[in-house]
Amino acid sequence: MVLPLSQPHFSGALLLLVVSNLLLWEKASAIPACMAQKSGCWNPLVETFNSAMQTAGTLRTLADQFYVELYHNQFSSGQFLIFNSNLIRRDETVARAGTYCHSTLSNPPDRGTEHADAETEKYLKTLINYVGAWIGPLYHVVIELNVMQDVPETILSKVRQIEENKRKLLEDLRWILTKVYPTAEMKEEFPAWEHLSFLKSQGKHYKLLAMFNLSNCIYNETYHILFYLRELKCQITGEDC
């Protein structure tokens, strides 16, 4: 039987269609999932860094407000002015409270160094301990403020908000560590706050001295946290360098 002249043409067209579909499928499968979204690439790691930086910015604002409130509210302003006066006179106890913080940060790792990845992992762990170091003290300050007399709601609410945002930031940092370094072993070591005994004492003077220490340290550390988060985001994600 003689085949119609159109059959080879039909078979060739069908073959071309199959091959074309296969090529399209291979091309589609090669596109990263994030590029296939209409809104563009969504990177959970970058978004978590953004969340952490937003929380750190909120902490910066709250720390400013808390610091100002303690110096202007009748509940604490008089004693804080005395602390500053004693600080100038180099009163040893007040100087310790006004200048020493129980948690510190080293310099971030240099970009592009030979062991940059290992240094970045180590520094991320250090930042976790740095942020977590004040959660315990803040928790105790909230407890003490709740039982002290004539505590303004503005002061109490600020401490609560700072504690909540500290916990939120800590969770973001923990997630980043497990995402970037899934096999990393993390030992969280939050140093003891030496002014806890002052906070737990009976005298208002010593309780406020503990808050003097906390407010100064929280006020200063929020600047550092924002800076180091930007550095880590750049080194880990390559974004916003």
Curated annotation (Swiss-Prot):
Residues 1-30 form the signal peptide. Disulfide bonds join C34-C41, C101-C217, C234-C241. Keywords: Disulfide bond, Glycoprotein, Hormone, Secreted, Signal. Detected only in placenta. Localized to spongiotrophoblasts and trophoblast giant cells of the placenta. It comes from the Eukaryota. InterPro entries: 4_helix_cytokine-like_core, Somatotropin/Prolactin. GO terms for cellular component: extracellular region. It is found in: Secreted. One of its GO terms (molecular function) is hormone activity. Its main location: secreted. Glycans are attached at N213, N220. It holds the Pfam family Hormone_1. Belongs to the somatotropin/prolactin family. This is Prolactin-8A9.
